[in-house]
Regions:
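Short acidic-hydrophobic surface loop/beta-edge motif
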Residues: 61-63
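Enriched for short, Lys/Arg-rich terminal
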Residues: 65-68, 73-97
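Basic, Lys/Arg-enriched alpha-helical interface segments
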Residues: 2-59
Length: 97
């Protein structure tokens, strides 16, 4: 399956990496690499993430990496990465539609 990153997800990963880089640029780079590795695993195991509790829709799922939720939608021939959020943040509905 093909992985597609939404503009919001790209903005979020950039914001988070910049925040981490304030204290440790190397940690920010490692964080980005690990997020991409986690997402790549979805190509083989798209249903490995849990259903997003707030939405309760089978096709919208999340995987957890550290303190972050990587939220994605399973589509016919692709997986769309919708957003990335800290686990303590409220999930804005606009980011998952």
């Amino acid at each position: 399956m093909k992985i597609i990153w939404s503009p919001i997800s790209i903005d979020r990963i950039t914001e988070i990496a910049k925040y981490i880089a304030i204290d440790n640029r190397r940690a920010a780079n490692t964080w980005i690499e690990e997020v991409f590795k986690k997402v790549e695993q979805l190509q083989s195991f798209p249903r490995s993430g849990r259903i997003v509790p707030e939405l309760n829709e089978d096709i919208i799922r999340e995987i957890i990496y550290g303190n972050y939720r990587i939220i994605y939608r399973i589509e016919l021939k692709q997986i769309s990465i919708l957003t990335i959020r800290n686990i303590r943040q409220i999930l804005p509905e606009i980011e998952v539609k």
